[in-house]
Regions:
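Alpha-helical segments flanking ligand/cofactor-binding loops in enzyme cores
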Residues: 31, 81-82, 136
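Hydrophobic hinge/microswitch elements
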Residues: 61-109, 116
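C-terminal effector-binding regulatory domain of bacterial HTH transcription factors
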Residues: 95-100, 104, 114-155
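Flexible hinge/capping segments at coil-to-helix
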Residues: 12-40
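Small-molecule pocket liners
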Residues: 13-19, 37, 53, 62, ...
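Short loop->beta-strand "edge-of-pocket" segments that line small-molecule binding or catalytic clefts
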Residues: 30-56
Length: 155
């Protein structure tokens, strides 16, 4: 079929504590990110569209449109994380990427009472009846690599 579920992963809203949070304070509500804070965000390399920040709490969902905000907008996850760790603003990044930086104190969670919907990860490959052993081994390795970060019911 050419697609395999890898994991369902969480997304963390983070900022650099020693510069960004110390200077600007933590946002009190997701809506404050639209008016009072610098944002590190993503844009689509295909469409140029800036992705909103998404928040959920107790059945309430807020989509924060950050297109008009000051900040940095990138289309690559390592650049995004680097911008966060450099103190350029508040952003949402995959939990598995943020984990070591949160553990070391380089990043802190902001708006911890709000979560972002879980994000599915998939691996896509050319479908073939005669799938090579190398491809199967690679796909299995990727699934195994992400298993510790899988928040789905499969765990």
């Amino acid at each position: 079929d050419g697609i395999r579920d890898v994991a369902v992963t969480g997304v963390q809203t983070c900022a650099l504590p020693i510069w960004y949070v110390a200077t600007h304070g933590a946002p009190p509500h997701p809506g404050a990110l639209q008016t009072d804070h610098d944002v590190v965000g993503y844009f689509s390399s295909l469409t140029g569209r800036v992705m909103p920040l998404l928040f959920e709490r107790d059945g309430e969902r807020i989509d924060v449109d950050v297109r008009s905000r000051h900040g940095v907008f990138v289309n690559e996850s390592t650049a995004h994380l680097t911008a966060l760790v450099s103190g350029l603003g508040v952003g949402q990044t995959f939990g598995f990427m943020a984990r070591p930086h949160l553990a070391s104190g380089a990043l802190v969670r902001v708006l911890p009472e709000w979560s972002r919907p879980l994000h599915p990860l998939h691996i896509v490959f050319h479908p073939s009846r005669n799938q090579s052993a190398r491809l199967r081994a690679f796909v299995d390795w990727v699934v195994e690599l992400f298993a510790p970060y899988d928040c789905s019911a499969r765990r």
